[in-house]
Amino acid sequence: MYVGRFVVVAPGIGAYRVSSRSFPNRRVTDRDGRLTVGPTPDAPETDNPYVSYNCARAVRTPTDEPLAVVGNGSHVDPIAEKLELGYPARDALATPLLALDFEKDDYDTPRIAGVVGAETATIGVVRRDGLVVEAVDEPTIVATYETDSPEPYALAAADAETPDAAAAATEVLGADFEHPVCAAGATVDADGATLAFDNDAE
């Protein structure tokens, strides 16, 4: 099944995967602590505005609470910025998702995102037909296609004694959905947020 890009979040852990039929020549890179999806050097040139973006960021709130943001587009940055200003996770997700709306491409691709705290998680999606933002207490997935409403997801990395961001990225990259490209993972505990990525989709 092809679900496109997807986010999985739970308290303390999150992940994001790029699945793509149109632009498979992409990788995640670490740019000054922000994980960025972008084209590989051999990728064909494109003017598509949705191909490159920050997909994961670690932030601190004004009360020094560590959080991580994952998502499939340019909305990740304003979500992170609102969290840094002290917005609750619900509002930090809802405001940029509503303002930027679904992607204006041929498929009306939804924007998806999640905010992960050490003991909390919130997931959001804006589609042509609606906006959903909800707090979750177990691993939950939302995708751009097919699974475009939040639903429970079996994420083994969330059950580890010590959750690992790299393990989360690798697990979702290997998930049984078509056209995997690359993935990012995030973990959050009292000491801070950790980001990792996996580009080995073979």
From Swiss-Prot:
The biological pathway it contributes to is: Purine metabolism; IMP biosynthesis via de novo pathway; IMP from 5-formamido-1-(5-phospho-D-ribosyl)imidazole-4-carboxamide: step 1/1
Q: A single GO molecular function, which one?
A: IMP cyclohydrolase activity
Arranged from A to Z, the UniProt key words for this protein are: Hydrolase, Purine biosynthesis
InterPro entries (alphabetical) = IMP_cyclohydrolase, IMP_cyclohydrolase-like, IMP_cyclohydrolase-like_sf
Q: What is its EC number?
A: 3.5.4.10
Q: Which HAMAP family match?
A: IMP_cyclohydrol (MF_00705)
What task does this protein carry out? Answer: Catalyzes the cyclization of 5-formylamidoimidazole-4-carboxamide ribonucleotide to IMP.
The UniProt entry's sequence similarity note says: Belongs to the archaeal IMP cyclohydrolase family.
Question: Which residues lie within the region annotated Disordered?
Answer: 27-48
Protein source organism = Halorubrum lacusprofundi (strain ATCC 49239 / DSM 5036 / JCM 8891 / ACAM 34)
Protein name (record): IMP cyclohydrolase
GO biological process terms, alphabetically, are: 'de novo' IMP biosynthetic process
Which chemical reaction does it catalyze?
IMP + H2O = 5-formamido-1-(5-phospho-D-ribosyl)imidazole-4-carboxamide
Extract the Pfam families matched here. IMP_cyclohyd (PF07826)
**Its gene?**
purO
Superkingdom is: Archaea
